[in-house]
């Protein structure tokens, strides 16, 4: 297996221009495809997940042109639901941001489409979404195991009253919201259980509004969406930088700055993961906010005990930053780590122990006490981009660290390690 050894880093200082947000890129691509008119997306993320969405749209007959660096995409809108005359199978890798929204959108009208992906995708639950779509009239078969992909979709979604469980993934609600305006009837979505990752719903609602559709959001418990609507292209849309990707650089600044500045997001960002910077500030770092940047400067870091449900992806970065904080850090209400690219609670606990931390892994929490001195280790990444990026922070000590399968960062950030090296001074 390929590996990358990072030598100890004495200091980080500099500016990182963030790649486009994965969450925003894939939502914007799908809405542009469904909309009337041509949409030019700029700062689109070039990564595996976005390529899977683009390939799927292409197979569904959507016309688009991509710039050579794949960050500018001109999409000719379909002006309504995506249809395929022939039966079709779409391979979506391990891209949840493609699988979930497409599973809903392709239930409009009458298609015969199979959505499949990598082995890990077949282990990621989608039953709550399938159940909700069936309530709205959709014909869906789970081809291997009930409640998991691959799915066979044969259209039929009408709208109406739909209940969806919000406790596992907000992407199920996102998928329903984006599909509902194109249904023949109005849709009323009622949330069962606690809604996780609420800020990701705000991204969805923001993008729908950008494409001309308003949703009646009743305290995140009930959403009313009028049917028989049409998305309208906004013309040009700039994809903001990826706030989850920003977390590694901001944490590096907190641990070994200097000052590290990330551009492409700022105080008015639509992504909830910018709140990650507040956690670093609470730990003792100095954070500065601009309209299109966030900067973080080193401080003496202290442990925190926090509910991280609102920033599950960025919260992983706090787990490795905790290695540099005084005291025991507890991250709570993170059950949905278990249904991501890998079981992230198990993976994080396992790898933190390798570098010497004392770790308590609960069903929905993790508690981390750093060692007096970090130990050298080879870090398994579980084909999970965030594991690789989180554990790069171990090098901000006097101990090197080896990252196995470093190229797994291609899911969201292909040149992550080059960007980290650019702002680093080795010990």
From Swiss-Prot:
Sites where the protein binds phosphoenolpyruvate: 22, 96, 124, 171, 344, 386, 411
A cellular component annotation (GO) from this entry: cytoplasm
EC number(s) from the headed UniProt entry: 2.5.1.19
Subcellular location: Cytoplasm
InterPro entries: Enolpyruvate_Tfrase_dom (IPR001986), Enolpyruvate_Tfrase_sf (IPR036968), EPSP_synthase (IPR006264), EPSP_synthase_CS (IPR023193), RNA3'P_cycl/enolpyr_Trfase_a/b (IPR013792)
Pathway: Metabolic intermediate biosynthesis; chorismate biosynthesis; chorismate from D-erythrose 4-phosphate and phosphoenolpyruvate: step 6/7
Subunit and interaction comment: Monomer.
Family: Belongs to the EPSP synthase family.
PANTHER family for the chain: AROM/DEHYDROQUINATE SYNTHASE (PTHR21090), PENTAFUNCTIONAL AROM POLYPEPTIDE (PTHR21090:SF5)
Protein name as catalogued: 3-phosphoshikimate 1-carboxyvinyltransferase
Organism: Klebsiella pneumoniae subsp. pneumoniae (strain ATCC 700721 / MGH 78578)
Gene: aroA
């Amino acid at each position: 297996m390929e590996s990358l050894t990072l030598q100890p880093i004495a200091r980080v200082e500099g500016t990182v221009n963030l790649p486009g947000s994965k969450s925003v890129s894939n939502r914007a691509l799908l809405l542009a495809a469904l909309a009337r008119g041509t949409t030019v997306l700029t700062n689109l993320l070039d990564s595996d997940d976005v390529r899977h969405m683009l390939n799927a749209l292409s197979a569904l007959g959507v016309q688009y042109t991509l710039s050579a660096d794949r960050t500018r995409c001109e999409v000719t809108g379909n002006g309504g639901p995506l249809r395929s005359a022939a039966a079709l199978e779409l391979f979506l890798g391990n891209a949840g941001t493609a699988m979930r929204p497409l599973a809903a959108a392709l239930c409009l009208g009458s298609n015969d489409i199979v959505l499949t992906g990598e082995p890990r995708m077949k282990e990621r639950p989608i039953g709550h979404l399938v159940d909700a779509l069936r309530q709205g009239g959709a014909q869906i078969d789970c081809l291997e195991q009930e409640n998991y992909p691959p799915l066979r979709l044969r259209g039929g979604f009408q709208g109406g009253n739909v209940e969806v469980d919000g406790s596992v993934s907000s992407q199920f609600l996102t998928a329903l919201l984006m599909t509902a305006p194109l249904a023949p009837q109005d849709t009323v979505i009622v949330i069962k259980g606690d809604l996780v990752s609420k800020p990701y719903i705000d991204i969805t609602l923001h993008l729908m509004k950008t494409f001309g559709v308003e949703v009646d959001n009743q305290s995140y418990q009930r959403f009313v969406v009028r049917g028989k609507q049409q998305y309208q292209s906004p013309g040009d849309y700039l994809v903001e930088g990826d706030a989850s990707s920003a977390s590694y650089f901001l944490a590096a600044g907190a641990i070994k700055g200097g000052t590290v500045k990330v551009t492409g997001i700022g105080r008015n960002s639509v992504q909830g993961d910018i709140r990650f910077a507040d956690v670093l500030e609470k730990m003792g770092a100095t954070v500065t906010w601009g309209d299109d940047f966030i900067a973080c400067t080193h401080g003496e870091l202290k442990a925190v005990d926090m509910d991280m449900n609102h920033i599950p992806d960025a919260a992983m970065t706090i787990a490795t930053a905790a290695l540099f904080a005084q005291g025991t850090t507890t991250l709570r209400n993170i059950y949905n780590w278990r249904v991501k690219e890998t079981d992230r609670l198990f993976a994080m606990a396992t790898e933190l122990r390798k570098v010497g931390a004392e770790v308590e892994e609960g069903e929905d929490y993790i508690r981390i006490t750093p060692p007096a001195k970090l130990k050298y280790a080879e870090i398994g990444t579980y084909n999970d981009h965030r594991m690789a990026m989180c554990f790069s922070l171990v090098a901000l000590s006097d101990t090197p660290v080896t990252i196995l399968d470093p190229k797994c960062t291609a899911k969201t950030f292909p040149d992550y390690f080059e960007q980290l090296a650019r702002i680093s001074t080795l010990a």
